[in-house]
């Protein structure tokens, strides 16, 4: 588990934006939503942007998280998606 200070800096529950940057893929947004749904079921409408050269996609998704542990778990699992380079 990550050792963060989210619990000191934030009040839960709260809306938390995740930005997932990965290789350009038509399925990246679906895979991001699938991971989020496992932990925080709901209706999500992620936004997607392709890099200027078309090499990467960035997916932004806003999730209402309930705890520091949920924030950290989502960071870890989103980073484990195949082709993901960064989770911000």
Swiss-Prot record:
Lineage at the top is: Bacteria, Pseudomonadati, Pseudomonadota, Gammaproteobacteria, Alteromonadales
Family recorded in the similarity comment: Belongs to the UPF0250 family.
Question: HAMAP family per the record?
Answer: UPF0250 (MF_00659)
Q: Show the InterPro entries listed in the entry.
A: UPF0250_YbeD-like, YbeD-like_sf
Q: Which domain of life is it from?
A: Bacteria
Write down any Gene Ontology CC term: cytosol
Q: Which organism is it from?
A: Shewanella sediminis (strain HAW-EB3)
Q: What is this protein called?
A: UPF0250 protein Ssed_3490
């Amino acid at each position: 588990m990550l050792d963060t200070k989210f619990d000191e800096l934030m009040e839960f529950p709260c809306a938390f934006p995740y930005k997932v940057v990965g290789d350009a893929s038509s399925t990246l947004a679906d895979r991001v939503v699938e991971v989020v749904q496992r932990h925080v079921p709901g209706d999500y409408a992620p936004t997607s942007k392709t890099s200027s050269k078309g090499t990467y996609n960035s997916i932004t998704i806003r999730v209402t998280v309930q705890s520091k542990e949920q924030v950290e778990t989502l960071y870890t699992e989103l980073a484990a998606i195949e082709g993901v380079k960064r989770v911000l």
